[in-house]
């Protein structure tokens, strides 16, 4: 993988807040934001304008945005994940491999990757999309992951580097996808985990709905009756998506609890 290094100096005296989604000047602010993302990606861009394009939503620029990179990244992602599954699971048939790949490249999986990469703070959005909760919109986060894959491939001109980056983002998701439980949605997995430990079922509460259809954002809270396990609040384009995201984070939180989980009195 391409080693992490410092980016070149930005243009002198850039406009204040020059990457507050209102301009695409390569400024010191952009350099700083990209440096943070670089550490998460595990890749340093040679062409900063390509990195910028990969983060630009069509609401900011209807012509110069990440949609073409997303198209390329989608194709690369399917190939990289498919190849990894082919070698990782030599005894699985075509149908099973297809379902496993679908699980790994679906929106919910890409949103998890986007959250791990902290992409929401890096996206370049139009004013309306920002106000409408676009930074947490599942479709935008998933698309941005794919666009970054396309951008890394074009920037590096190296499939091996691209593959290494993508697989590092997935971590142990590919190893765990062979587990039938990993193929179930997060809410089902959370419920089964709690039932297996004789805990109460999780409680989901719709906290608020932001914006107007078709660009509404639903905010949901997930609660479990376990000591030292704070509530999880997440948002999504639908209540179902928000609940799934909250359940996924709750599962991760439960797995990190020290000792034996205990029920609240």
Curated annotation (Swiss-Prot):
InterPro entries linked to this entry: dsRBD_dom, RNase_III, RNase_III_dom, RNase_III_sf
SMART domains on file: DSRM (SM00358), RIBOc (SM00535)
Entry's localization field: Cytoplasm
Keyword Oxidoreductase among UniProt keywords: no
Class of this enzyme: hydrolase
Catalytic activity: Endonucleolytic cleavage to 5'-phosphomonoester
A Pfam short name: dsrm
GO annotation, cellular component aspect: cytoplasm
Domain DRBM intervals: 185-256
Domain of life: Bacteria
Residue numbers binding Mg(2+): 70, 143, 146
Active site per the UniProt annotation: 74, 146
Gene Ontology annotations of biological process type: mRNA processing; rRNA processing; tRNA processing
Keywords tagged on the record: Cytoplasm, Endonuclease, Hydrolase, Magnesium, Metal-binding, mRNA processing, Nuclease, RNA-binding, rRNA processing, rRNA-binding, tRNA processing
Known cofactor(s): Mg(2+)
UniProt entry tagged with the keyword Secreted: no
Chain segments annotated as coiled-coil in the UniProt record: none
Domain RNase III residues, every copy: 34-157
Gene3D superfamilies (UniProt xref): 3.30.160.20, Ribonuclease III domain
GO MF entry, a single one: metal ion binding
Similarity field: Belongs to the ribonuclease III family.
Functional description taken from the UniProt entry: Digests double-stranded RNA. Involved in the processing of primary rRNA transcript to yield the immediate precursors to the large and small rRNAs (23S and 16S). Processes some mRNAs, and tRNAs when they are encoded in the rRNA operon. Processes pre-crRNA and tracrRNA of type II CRISPR loci if present in the organism.
Assembly notes: Homodimer.
Protein name as catalogued: Ribonuclease 3
